[in-house]
Amino acid sequence: MHLALNFKQKPYIGFVLIPDKNQLWITDGKKTWCEKRDGTKYKPNLLNNKNLQEMTLVTSKNHGNEILRNLIQKINFCKVQIMGSIGCKIASIVHGESDIYICLSLPGKSAPKDWDFAAPESILKSAGGAITNLDNQELSYGKSSFQQGGIIVATNDKKNHPSVCVEIKKIIQ
């Protein structure tokens, strides 16, 4: 479950609930933390892998396509983890279980919506990560279609994020 409060068309406060892991990821817009069902709290633990080949990719179990599979094969990530919702994928980055998430929506196919990305984005950004389209432009919310199409990249390091996008773009072209 994802819940976000957007301010000026950008997610600010967010909650991502992952019941099967007993995790509730929360951001107040300044910091991110996780609360377990027993009341235990812990902070983000983002990894510091800078090279794509050293990174662990988290990707979808249901929305893969041939272009994304080819990209994953060309990059030769250290490890690839498959899991469900965008919130789970972003939480895995913030928790230090993975480094990068790539979402590729093809024209004419179903694309993730604002409500899929808003809360996870707010949690990742306040933890020190970044999420943009492949051209390193921030996601835009509140469009009439509510769709977040194209290629979206989420990483564990906002400083290294632009160079990761450039590297992925070179591999695709």
Give the label of every model feature segment:
Residues F15, D28, K36, N45, ...:
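Short linear motifs in exposed loops
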Residues P11, T40-P44, V80:
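Tryptophan-centered short beta-strand motifs
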Residues M1-R37:
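DPxDG-like acidic metal-binding loop motif
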Residues L46-Q173:
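An extended, acidic
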Residues H2-L3, P44-L47:
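A generic local secondary-structure boundary/capping motif
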